[in-house]
């Protein structure tokens, strides 16, 4: 009988990550239906990036989708940003494994600057959807031949609808009203907490003048505006 040396034994473990988005009004996992791209970042105990991977497209909508990750056994700080692509309204810096730190992984909302004297920062288009997920200490072990860990996601973006309607039925002229929202919420840290940022002014990306029956789009007595 032959005895295999320790170096000849296959002790490899397959690690996979499942992303779950059920923090919504339906309390159902909507990841496969809503998320089109997802990036996972893994940091070591010193906050140094050791691994990152992005997957996108139809594969995310497949039943039972999980992301295969090539990590050594150990403890990792996992961070996920989802919804980022070339057309996204948000961006994160390029980071490099072995060099970049956790604090560098900030997410910034795109904005325009007005020609006014104060150079106001403006957001006047519909925001693309953005999700964030984090597991501060996830252990990957050799206890089994495979391991699946879950990263829960929260959605950062929302749509605000403002409806202005005259009670006496008199037509509301859409061009006579302007709605804006101001906030300094355009810069998020790796843990999804807001960082200090300039004030942003949000303008409606969609305006409609409709009837008193809000199920119609005919001219009438109500104005409907959407802001992201």
Segments predicted by a language model, with ranges:
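Bacterial Sec-dependent N-terminal signal peptides
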Residues: 1-21
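Residue-level recognition of well-ordered beta-strand positions that form the cores
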Residues: 18-22, 41, 81, 163-165, ...
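Structural motif
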Residues: 21-33, 163-172
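Acidic, serine/threonine- and glycine-rich low-complexity intrinsically disordered segments
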Residues: 112-226
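Tryptophan-paired
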Residues: 38-93, 172-228
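N-terminal low-complexity, intrinsically disordered tails enriched in Ser/Pro/Gly
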Residues: 2-7, 26-32, 54
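Short, solvent-exposed beta-strand/turn "edge" segments of beta-rich domains on protein surfaces
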Residues: 6-9, 29, 150-155
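Short, low-hydrophobicity acidic/polar segments
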Residues: 49-155
């Amino acid at each position: 009988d032959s005895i295999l040396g320790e170096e000849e034994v296959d002790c490899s473990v397959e690690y996979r990550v499942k992303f779950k988005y059920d923090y919504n009004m339906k309390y159902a996992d909507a990841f496969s239906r809503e998320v089109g791209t997802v990036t996972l970042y893994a940091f070591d105990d010193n906050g140094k990036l050791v691994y990152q991977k992005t997957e996108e497209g139809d594969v995310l909508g497949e039943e039972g989708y999980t992301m295969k990750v090539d990590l050594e056994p150990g403890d990792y700080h996992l961070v996920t940003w989802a919804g980022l692509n070339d057309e996204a309204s948000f961006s994160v810096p390029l980071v490099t494994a072995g060099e970049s730190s956790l604090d560098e992984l900030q997410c910034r909302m795109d904005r325009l600057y007005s020609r006014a004297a104060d150079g106001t920062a403006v957001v006047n288009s519909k925001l693309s959807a953005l999700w964030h997920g984090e597991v501060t200490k996830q252990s990957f072990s050799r206890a089994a031949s495979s391991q699946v860990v879950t990263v829960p996601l929260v959605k950062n973006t929302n749509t605000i609808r403002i409806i202005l309607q005259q009670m006496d039925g008199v037509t509301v002229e859409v061009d006579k009203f302007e709605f804006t929202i101001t906030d300094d919420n355009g810069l998020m840290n790796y843990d999804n907490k807001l960082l200090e940022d300039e004030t942003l002014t949000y303008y409606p990306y969609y305006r409609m003048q409709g009837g008193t029956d809000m199920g119609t789009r005919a001219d009438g007595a109500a104005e409907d505006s959407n802001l992201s």
